């Protein structure tokens, strides 16, 4: 499945790895994991990672981005990971590269790279990179293995979401052969300061329901300023405080930012991706996102989700 990707890696002396902006564990994990796999198995190659600040995933060993000049893209291979659309790629200079490759597990919305491997059935992009390593018979680097395991954990919801398969656990077992402790992953991911627990309690108190049981939270700029929390912590970080509510199969978290209203859509049963796509976003069948211009547009999205919850097709 990955032979064309491996051929591209073998054919280039310099490789620059991209992922989506506002990175999550899967984006950082797949980027870091692939970087260190290539470095371990092709020691003569130059391998760099680029993008915005890894933020809360800075605990992942080796995740720091590199300083890469425009000239370094000449003759290089750019690999794009965990990006469902070109507008999501952090650092658009991938287009300067001689050759481009994309590995992704989001629903396909259009070609970005010269060579693409798109597999929505995978629980994570980290799972895809792990499968590539297994197919190639790579030497498994511990830094790479821990980074990839981290992304598998986060994007599978701790191996809970329905994209988790027997193959997922086989890949996880393969990574654990590198000898890291799962505590090295789970503790920095899920151990929280008291303030974060209190913040989550605050957002639980904000949950509202639509007529047909879509749970939602809306946080405006004034409240964001008052809370002093960053956009990622509130938008993606608080989306799943609405999961596991009896009778609720769709939930959405709206967060006002300088760039617009961040919309994090989730579902336990419905394919909410068409709603995200309708509003310029994308993602997975049961976990998608979009950024809309204002509250009025966000409420139209909420209305569409309410119709979906009542059985309508969007």
Sequence positions of predicted segments:
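Hydrophobic helix-and-loop "lid/oligomerization" segment in the mid-to-C-terminal part
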Residues: 2-18, 29-58, 71-75, 157-314
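Histidine-centered active-site/metal-ligand motif
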Residues: 18-20, 26, 103-106, 284
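Short glycine-rich anion-binding loops that position phosphate/pyrophosphate groups of nucleotides
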Residues: 21-23, 83-86, 106-108, 221-223, ...
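Short glycine/serine/threonine-rich phosphate/pyrophosphate-binding segments
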Residues: 26-31, 87-89
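Active-site cofactor/cluster-binding pocket
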Residues: 61-115
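Solvent-exposed alpha-helices and their adjacent loops that cap or buttress functional pockets
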Residues: 71-72, 93-95, 109-110, 140-142, ...
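Short alpha-helices
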Residues: 106-171
């Amino acid at each position: 499945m990955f032979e064309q990707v491996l051929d591209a890696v073998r054919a280039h002396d310099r490789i620059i790895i991209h992922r989506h902006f506002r990175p999550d564990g899967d984006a950082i994990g797949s980027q870091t994991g692939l970087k260190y796999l290539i470095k371990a198995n092709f020691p003569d190659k130059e391998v760099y990672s680029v993008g915005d600040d890894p933020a809360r995933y800075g605990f992942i060993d080796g995740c720091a981005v590199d300083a890469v000049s425009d000239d370094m893209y000449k003759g290089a291979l750019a690999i794009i990971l965990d990006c469902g659309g070109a507008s999501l790629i952090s650092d658009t200079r991938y287009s300067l590269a001689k050759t481009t490759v994309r590995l992704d597990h989001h629903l396909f919305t259009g070609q970005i790279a010269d060579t693409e491997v798109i597999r929505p059935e995978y629980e994570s992009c980290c799972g895809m990179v792990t499968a590539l390593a297994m197919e190639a018979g790579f030497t498994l680097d511990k830094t790479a293995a821990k980074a990839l395991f981290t992304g598998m954990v986060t994007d599978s919801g701790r191996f809970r979401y329905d994209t988790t398969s027997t193959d997922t656990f086989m890949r996880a077992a393969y990574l654990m052969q590198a000898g890291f402790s799962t505590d090295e992953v789970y503790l920095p991911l899920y151990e929280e300061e008291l303030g974060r627990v209190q913040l989550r309690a605050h957002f639980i108190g904000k949950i509202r329901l639509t007529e047909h049981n879509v749970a939602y939270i809306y946080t405006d700029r004034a409240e964001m300023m008052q809370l002093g929390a960053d956009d990622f912590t509130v938008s993606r970080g608080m989306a799943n405080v609405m999961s596991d509510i009896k009778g609720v199969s769709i939930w959405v978290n709206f967060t006002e930012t300088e760039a617009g209203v961040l919309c994090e859509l989730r579902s336990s049963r419905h394919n909410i991706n068409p709603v995200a796509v309708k509003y310029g976003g994308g993602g997975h069948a049961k976990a998608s996102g979009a950024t809309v211009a204002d509250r009025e547009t966000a409420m139209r999205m909420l209305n569409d989700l309410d119709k979906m919850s009542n059985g309508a097709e969007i």
